[in-house]
C-alpha cells in the first residue's frame, strides 16, 4: 500500500515538474540564420541562382538589371514600416518578400530588353520571324437539286 502511494506521488511530482519546465522554457525562438546562398524559406528559384547570371547576361538589359537590382536591394534591406510593425520575424520576412514581388512586377523592361529576354529563353533570335499558319475554313458547297 505504501509503495503504490509513493509511486503515484512520484509520478505526479515528475509530471508537474516536467510540465512547468516546458512552459518556462518556451521563449520566442530566434530567427533562423540562412545558410550562404540560401533564402530562409528554402532554396532560391532557378531563375535567381547565380549560374544564370540574371538579366546582365542578356544583351540590352544592363540598365534594366541595374534599376531592378537597386530597387530590390533597397526593399530587401529596409522593407517598409508596415513590415516592421509585424510581430514575428517570419511575418516580417514574408511581408518584405511580398513587397519585393510587387515591386518586381511593376518594373517594366524596355522593349529591346524584353525581346532579348524572350530570345534568350526560347533560343529564337529577334531577327528570326516565325509565321504561324492562319486557319482557313473551307466553305461547304451544297448541291442544288436540278429540276427536270
UniProtKB/Swiss-Prot annotation:
Residues 1-21 form the signal peptide. Residues 125-148 are annotated as: Disordered. Its main location: secreted. Expressed by the venom gland. Residues 22-38 form a propeptide. GO terms for cellular component: extracellular region. It is found in: Secreted. Keywords: Disulfide bond, Ion channel impairing toxin, Secreted, Signal, Toxin. Probable ion channel inhibitor. One of its GO terms (molecular function) is toxin activity. The keyword Disulfide bond applies. It comes from Hadronyche infensa (Fraser island funnel-web spider). Contains 2 disulfide bonds. This is U5-hexatoxin-Hi1a.
Amino acid at each position: 500500500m505504501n509503495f503504490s502511494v509513493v509511486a503515484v506521488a512520484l509520478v505526479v511530482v515528475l509530471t508537474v515538474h516536467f510540465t512547468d519546465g516546458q512552459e518556462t522554457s518556451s521563449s520566442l525562438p530566434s530567427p533562423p540564420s540562412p545558410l550562404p546562398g540560401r533564402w530562409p524559406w528554402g532554396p532560391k528559384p532557378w531563375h535567381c541562382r547565380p549560374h544564370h547570371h540574371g538579366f546582365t547576361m542578356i544583351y540590352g538589359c544592363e540598365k534594366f538589371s541595374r534599376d531592378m537590382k537597386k530597387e530590390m536591394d533597397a526593399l530587401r534591406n529596409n522593407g517598409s514600416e508596415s513590415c516592421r510593425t509585424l510581430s514575428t520575424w517570419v511575418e516580417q520576412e514574408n511581408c518584405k518578400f511580398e513587397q519585393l514581388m510587387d515591386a518586381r512586377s511593376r518594373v517594366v523592361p524596355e522593349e529591346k530588353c524584353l525581346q532579348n529576354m524572350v530570345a534568350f529563353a526560347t533560343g529564337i533570335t529577334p531577327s528570326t520571324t516565325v509565321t504561324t499558319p492562319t486557319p482557313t475554313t473551307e466553305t461547304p458547297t451544297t448541291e442544288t437539286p436540278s429540276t427536270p
